[in-house]
């Protein structure tokens, strides 16, 4: 490939990904400066007798049923287990935390602020499609850096 094609490819990739990189730099910089965002938590009443078996083979279906029984219409891509609780993912938008307690199940609705949502995307906790975009962006950034270095020499 001749030099002009490399320059055009480099500039196109750089121009396309600059807005994304600016958002990543801003969200990461604000996080490091202590602006981590916030999450508004609301406890949701759970039906009497609701239970949650964290070792269930049908955990996704169990959680979907528990949410539906509580009157919550929510689609999630996967669950993250931690201790005696489960978190629906992605956490870059409204999500739910279900905790197994001695009294049954505690469900809490979590609504992240814009900054918290940006941090969650930055950490890779966004939707699966966005994660694929991030992988592509990482390759494009590597291309921009290497081609820029090579073209500058």
Describe the residue ranges of each PLM region.
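Membrane-proximal low-complexity regions enriched in glycine and acidic/polar residues
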Residues: 24, 28-82
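Exposed beta-strand-loop-beta-strand "reactive/processing" segments of non-cytosolic proteins
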Residues: 74-98
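Mixed-charge, polar/low-complexity N-terminal
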Residues: 5-6, 11-12, 85-88, 126
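Charge-dense, low-complexity intrinsically disordered segments
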Residues: 3, 53, 108
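Internal alpha-helical transmembrane segments
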Residues: 1-38, 132-153
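Short, mixed-charge, low-aromatic patches
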Residues: 14-24, 71-79, 104-108
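Extended, hydrophilic extramembrane loops/domains of integral membrane proteins
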Residues: 90-143
């Amino acid at each position: 490939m001749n030099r002009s094609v490399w320059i055009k490819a480099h500039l196109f990739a750089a121009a396309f990904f600059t807005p994304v990189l600016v958002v990543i730099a801003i969200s990461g910089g604000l996080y490091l400066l202590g602006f981590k965002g916030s999450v508004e938590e609301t406890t949701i009443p759970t039906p009497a007798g609701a239970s949650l078996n964290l070792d269930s083979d049908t955990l996704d279906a169990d959680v979907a049923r528990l949410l539906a029984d509580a009157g919550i219409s929510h689609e999630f891509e996967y669950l993250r287990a931690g201790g005696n609780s489960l978190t629906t993912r992605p956490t870059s938008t409204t999500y739910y935390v279900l905790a197994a307690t001695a009294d049954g199940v505690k469900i809490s609705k979590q609504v992240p602020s814009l900054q918290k949502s940006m941090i969650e995307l930055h950490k890779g906790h966004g939707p699966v499609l966005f994660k694929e975009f991030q992988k592509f962006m990482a390759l494009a950034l590597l291309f921009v850096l290497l081609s820029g270095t090579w073209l500058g020499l």
